[in-house]
């Protein structure tokens, strides 16, 4: 079982594509700056930490209106 679950993550964002994009960008940012917002992450990988931040509500995304 993955933690956080895809169901809880999909409640935070509107699509799987958005979830992947936001978490990948945040993971790259963490690799460069070493600044995780979660104090005790369960995952040791950057993408896992980014997903935990999304699930905790620390990382949000607003859709751009075109």
Swiss-Prot record:
Enzyme class: transferase
Keywords: DNA-directed RNA polymerase, Nucleotidyltransferase, Transcription, Transferase
GO molecular function: DNA binding; DNA-directed RNA polymerase activity
BP terms from Gene Ontology: DNA-templated transcription
Enzyme Commission number(s): 2.7.7.6
Role noted for this protein: Promotes RNA polymerase assembly. Latches the N- and C-terminal regions of the beta' subunit thereby facilitating its interaction with the beta and alpha subunits.
Assembly: The RNAP catalytic core consists of 2 alpha, 1 beta, 1 beta' and 1 omega subunit. When a sigma factor is associated with the core the holoenzyme is formed, which can initiate transcription.
Family stated for the protein in its record: Belongs to the RNA polymerase subunit omega family.
Name this polypeptide is given: DNA-directed RNA polymerase subunit omega
Domain of life: Bacteria
Gene Ontology, cellular component aspect: DNA-directed RNA polymerase complex
Reactions catalysed, as given in the entry: RNA(n) + a ribonucleoside 5'-triphosphate = RNA(n+1) + diphosphate
Pfam families with a match to the protein in the record: RNA_pol_Rpb6
Originating species: Bacillus licheniformis (strain ATCC 14580 / DSM 13 / JCM 2505 / CCUG 7422 / NBRC 12200 / NCIMB 9375 / NCTC 10341 / NRRL NRS-1264 / Gibson 46)
